[in-house]
Swiss-Prot record:
GO terms for biological process: negative regulation of DNA-templated transcription initiation. This is Transcriptional regulator MraZ. Forms oligomers. HAMAP family: MraZ (MF_01008). PROSITE patterns: SPOVT_ABRB. Residues 5-47, 76-119 form the SpoVT-AbrB domain. It is found in: Cytoplasm, Nucleoid.
Length: 143
């Protein structure tokens, strides 16, 4: 399980250091793709395979299902660590997430999310005030 929040810088070549505990959980080979809310999602291979199976079962006759799977899979790339524990984030994914220099890496249960520092701070500031309301709505899901 991934949890926690860390700040790191991305270098001019697009390489980002991921915290050691997240590297361990992601394994030697993992998948990064476009995430929701203008961030990136990183999945260990086993989680990615499970997600892929669920998404493959969506009805391709539905426009929303086609649009989502196109967006999600076209941005996906398999990654490995370099000797310094960094991952090279492709330019298209850096652009999607607005990554310039400072990044925030967060653990979210079965995945790691990578945010530009500015977008994370904006998202957090907007969401923090409604945390209680969101929690009340989740009661409907028996959480």
């Amino acid at each position: 399980m991934f949890m926690g929040e860390y700040q790191h810088s991305i270098d001019e070549k697009g390489r980002l250091t991921i915290p050691a505990k997240f590297r361990e959980g992601l394994g030697t080979s993992f998948v990064i793709t476009r995430g929701l809310d203008q961030c990136l999602f990183a999945y260990p291979q086993d989680e990615w395979k499970q997600l892929e199976e669920r998404l493959k079962s969506l009805p391709f006759t539905k426009a929303d299902a086609r649009a989502f799977t196109r967006f999600f899979f076209s941005g996906a790339t398999e990654c490995e660590w370099d000797k310094q524990g960094r991952v090279n984030i492709p330019p298209n994914l850096r652009e999607h997430a607005g990554m310039q220099k400072e990044c925030v890496i967060i653990g979210v249960s079965n995945r790691v999310e990578v945010w530009s520092k500015e977008r994370w701070e904006d998202y957090f500031a907007q969401s923090e005030g409604s945390f209680g309301e969101i929690a009340e709505k989740l009661v409907d899901f028996n959480l």
